[in-house]
Amino acid sequence: MSNSKEIKSFLWTQSLRRELSGFCTNTRVQVIKDAQSLLHGLDFSEVSNIQRLMRKEKRDDSDLKRLRDLNQTVNNLVELKSSQQKNTLRVGALTSDDLLVLAADLDRLKAKVNRSERPLTGGVYMGNLTQQQLDQRKILLQLVGMGGSRVPPRGGDGIVRVWDVRNPDLLNNQFGTMPSLTLACLCKQGQEDLSDVVKALTDLGLVYTAKYPNLSDLDKLTHTHPVLGLIDGNKSAINISGYNFSLNAAVKAGASLLDGGNMLETIKVTPKNIDTILKCVLKVKRSVGMFVSDTPGERNPYENILYKICLSGDGWPYIACRTSISGRAWDNTEVDLGTNKDPINKGPPTSNKTAGAAGFNAGLTYSQMMELKDSMLQIDPTAKTWVDIEGRADDPVEIAIYQPSNGHYIHFYREPTDIKQFRQDAKYSHGIDVQDLFTTQPGLTSAVLENLPKNMVLTCQGVEDIRKLLDSQGRKDIKLIDVSMQKADARKFEHQIWDEYKHLCSMHTGIVVEKKKRGGKEEITPHCALLDCLMFEATTRNSLDIVIPRPVLSKDLVFRSATPKVIL
């Protein structure tokens, strides 16, 4: 981290301390009391065993059960703990603008945390390989034609950490550090007097009042307090447990021992003051320009306090035991924007044109955009890729992108702007009901086309409209190959494709007719962008033997939420 980033981050911390000083409490006595309780009641042979499990190359459900059992014992022995609390934030102490900011920032934070804790794309090996092994694996995969694969980022010690468990939700809230537990472990496992440990961590906390203690500071303090030599200077990896001796854990413990220091670690949140605390946090956000960072990894001070306060809302968010809490911050905090409609009087679907007035986002949210980017990593930039659209180049209503080599496809819809022209196209081409498009996700066309790999080559049956669409979205770098099949040839396998893959699309509900050269009309099969791609591929191969199609986008991305109420 650069010095400017460190200074800015600490500026945020200092500003938050000043603004939230009225919510700080004296926790020194209770932290020491809880540490004594842990020293007398905790089985430190099991603590040592848990520390061993955290060093294993593979951790499974049995390891998680042992960790959760020990965490429950710790929870039963301490008094500083946070309680399960569902928070509903409404207009009051917080204005409607405040609520919108909180909703947006929690949404961004959710996306960041999810990106930090999961691989960038499906199918990535998440075992405990060293970075050297992962680099060799990448070379080998490229050798066998799987060059699109990506490797997850490594942890601070060169090991990719992973829990191989059936229910990942059981991992939530099981890894935070607690000052009382840090004190107890340093005392027992370092064979030091509790009073010496308290003095050492208090001095570390005093340094923290002026700066973030670093390894150089730790080394100097170790000359006076040898127990600090147990502190591990390596950066903590994700999901490694609260029983480690990290510098962050020691600094947090030191801060909790400073009565009167206005340390964020001593803040106590209750259902009565949570709105006021968040109001103060937003005041600091505006004054010093705090924000939720796009970069996955450690949380900055604003992200940290926002997450911790919204996780429980009842207790000491930084230092209390929270292993009994289920869910994440966005699960336990609801932002009520006051835009709910009575579901009993539910009318026809709301058009995207009026969705903004009903409280809907005009485009993709931050978390949706992050999900879209992650999902589109499944697209192989070098593979043969079909593209087809329904509607006009300047007003498309259905777009499909399909890769026959792996079966991956992107398929979504768009509400038209020219309803009169749409009805003509529906009658003679696609047969889509405009009301079925009112719940489609606005902004998805631009987002998908923007995130297609650079200089990609797309194959199509008819190039003019697709070229215009791509150019309108600034994607002149994408090249097009027009197969230019005769109409009858292109639709050679139409009935077989519809028989086999009709379940992939249910939007083409209308009757479509075709004008005959000698007059009159004939009913024909509607044109579906996705199924057209499948039949074009079947025609070029003269075979129906194709890879099972697999959607890249989730349904939640293709269709917007049915209610404007934001649940975080």
From Swiss-Prot:
Zn(2+) binds at E398, C505, H508, C528. Belongs to the arenaviridae nucleocapsid protein family. This is Nucleoprotein. It comes from Mobala mammarenavirus (isolate Rat/Central African Republic/Acar 3080/1983) (MOBV). InterPro entries: Nucleocapsid_arenaviridae, Nucleocapsid_C_arenaviridae, Nucleocapsid_C_sf, Nucleocapsid_N_arenaviridae. Its EC number is 3.1.13.-. Residues 54-240 are annotated as: Binding site for the cap structure m7GTP. GO terms for biological process: negative stranded viral RNA replication; RNA-templated viral transcription; symbiont-mediated suppression of host cytoplasmic pattern recognition receptor signaling pathway via inhibition of IKBKE activity.
